[in-house]
Amino acid sequence: MSHSPTPLAAIVLAAGKGTRMKSQKAKVLHEVGGRPLAWFPTRRALEIGANPVVAVVGHQAEAVEAALAATLPGAPLRFAVQREQLGTAHAVLSAREALGRYQGAVLILSGDTPLLRAETLSRVVAARAGATLSLATMRLADPHGYGRIVRDPAGTPARVVEEKDATDAERALDEVNAGLYCADAAFLWEALSKVGSANAQREFYLTDLVAMAARAGGVVAVPVPPEEASGVNDREELARAGRVLLRRRASELMRSGVTIEDPERFDCDEGVEIGADAVIEPNVRLKGRTRIGAGCRLGAGAILTDAVLADGVTVKPYTVIEEATVAARAILGPFSRLRPGSDIGEEAHVGNFVETKKARLGKGAKANHLTYLGDATIGAGANVGAGTITCNYDGEKKHPTTIGEGAFIGSDSILVAPIEIGAGAYVAAGSTLTESVPPGALALGRAKQVTKEGWVARRKAEAQNKGAAEAAPAPSPADSPRGGRAS
């Protein structure tokens, strides 16, 4: 993290609606990498030491404020409301009160630029030291829609002209404004007070500051890659930005010792942590505050949300883990589901089509097949057979199930909570238990088996005889003992 050596504040412009998103939600609330768009420039400004950072909000102001406060807890954030959308200069001026008596450099950036790097912001801030204003520029093969950079005969930026106000010659220019500026606060407020709206859109353009700064003491242009500075205006651009962020993240992780088998099929939110020597198979999705320990292996199609995995955990394909904790060397899946509150112990096994919810499995405990464990505590070394169900809900309340260390639960057992199976106890397959079982005991909760030898043959013979009788023709009246004429 590179901090500015001089006082630095930042203003993030996040007031617009974003009509091209075709959404009821404000543009800057749309997410990439599990974060709202406005989070990215705000976070990058914080990374280079900006304090405070003022977010100018407008459309859905309360929701934008809440999203930034929730995703940047404890950060020196302030908020300013632009009640009327009168242009970018008006938006920046809306932040003046929030900055109070602050004197120093002010970095201005757009809230829809998730690809900006902290290093780029630092370059723009550093460039201002030799001028009244610094701004980022980029060269585009198709500059349509962007403000063009007009330079003087000496090659110094003289002004920015917006697309709708440009002449044909100016529209032919390929150097455009990237919407990232740095200026001294004193100059900024004085210049903004002089900006007018005599332009094609009748708006107060922030870009008018460039001409004012050129006259006051000079402007420095800082070239930046188009990929980095381009804003997000619609869903296609949102998706493209997301892929760029994922490629960056995959590259960063691989350089730190993580194996990602196919970086093009890797999906990871901002803030996810992955330890060295972890292996990520294709189509894994890592969300929220997930933490992956060293040496873990995540199988294809696994989805982890706010999960914490210790070192050496194996997650087989298509396992879903949400708000669960998994200890070292545990084995999960394939096709298992760990719901919130699950706590899986060291070397425990949770196998295919097993679902856990608020369940704790001790060291080496196993539930390998077709099982539901809800509100359950499973002791170390216990084995839960296929098809076992903990019936934790009575229609009104949840109840706990406790299975002691070394206990053995036979297949297709139903444990009706609240219930406790003692350490080392056995439950016979197919049992339905409603009472606790003492340690070391065997519990059978099923009907007694009855075997009837020869029953199948007798049943088949009866069926055949019945079928033959039903198929025989009915007797005619003449054949009846009462059917003839009396003599």
Swiss-Prot record:
Enzyme class: transferase
Keyword Lipoprotein: no
Region span, Pyrophosphorylase: 1-235
Span list, region Linker: 236-256
EC number(s) per entry: 2.7.7.23, 2.3.1.157
Note accompanying the cofactor annotation: Binds 1 Mg(2+) ion per subunit.
Name of the protein this chain belongs to: Bifunctional protein GlmU
Sequence positions that bind Mg(2+): 112, 233
Cofactor(s) needed for function: Mg(2+)
Pathway of action: Nucleotide-sugar biosynthesis; UDP-N-acetyl-alpha-D-glucosamine biosynthesis; N-acetyl-alpha-D-glucosamine 1-phosphate from alpha-D-glucosamine 6-phosphate (route II): step 2/2; Nucleotide-sugar biosynthesis; UDP-N-acetyl-alpha-D-glucosamine biosynthesis; UDP-N-acetyl-alpha-D-glucosamine from N-acetyl-alpha-D-glucosamine 1-phosphate: step 1/1; Bacterial outer membrane biogenesis; LPS lipid A biosynthesis
Location(s), subcellular: Cytoplasm
